[in-house]
Amino acid sequence: MILYEYPFNERIRTLLRLEDLFERLDFFLTQEHPLQHHVALTTLFEIVDVAGRADLKSDLLKELDRQRQTLTVLRSNPQIDQEALDAVIAELETASGNLTATHGKAGQLIADNEWLTSIRSRAIIPGGTCEFDLPAYFAWQHHPGERRRADIVKWAQPLVPLRDATMIVLRLLRESGQSGKVIANAGSYQQMLSGRIYQLMQVRLDDVALGFIPEISANKYMLWVRFTQQDGDLRPKPVDADIPFQLKLCNF
């Protein structure tokens, strides 16, 4: 089974990008080869670039607080598992408190580190991090894997509150929708939204339909999913078959 997600606004698009980058950082950070730690470090630079949006922190804090207030009202509902509810509220409060405690721009520690800044500026140049360009970085890559990993973890540590806030907001958003089975007749599916506002759409394909690729577009009035399939040169071509899939529309 494969899951495709489509954000309806720039804020959710930014959070999805951060989630993807944090997951990539986690993966390469657990590896041992210097080249894998190079990817981890350049991924950290990408996280700083994406997280540099001025209003991202305030947006996350507002969303965490809104979710906390919404869930707090449910404490008087006897049909709600109060223990699970309290755990989520506590998680929101912790994430909000930790994010509030951060100071300066995201990645300020990296920006203030002249050595990291030199690597960051060279990393955007194709082949720009060779040993003759950055001999000190080349030497660092020959340190033991545990030492390199500890360094990257230290540099990434100030971004942990941002990561935690991003993950809980996306998790609650994904849990807010209900999935339904639909069919793309002749490879195409349309649905009127009647002005209802959504923030995220999920298209889930089972194993039989893994070869089909959804092209998704949406606005506040309707959504459109058109399936394509790659030919021998991997170029997309339209699909005329009826394709069943699961559709989920999410909104807080």
Swiss-Prot record:
It is found in: Cytoplasm. One of its GO terms (biological process) is division septum assembly. Its main location: cytoplasm. One of its GO terms (cellular component) is cytoplasm. The keyword Cell cycle applies. Belongs to the ZapD family. Cell division factor that enhances FtsZ-ring assembly. Directly interacts with FtsZ and promotes bundling of FtsZ protofilaments, with a reduction in FtsZ GTPase activity. This is Cell division protein ZapD. It comes from Ralstonia nicotianae (strain ATCC BAA-1114 / GMI1000) (Ralstonia solanacearum).
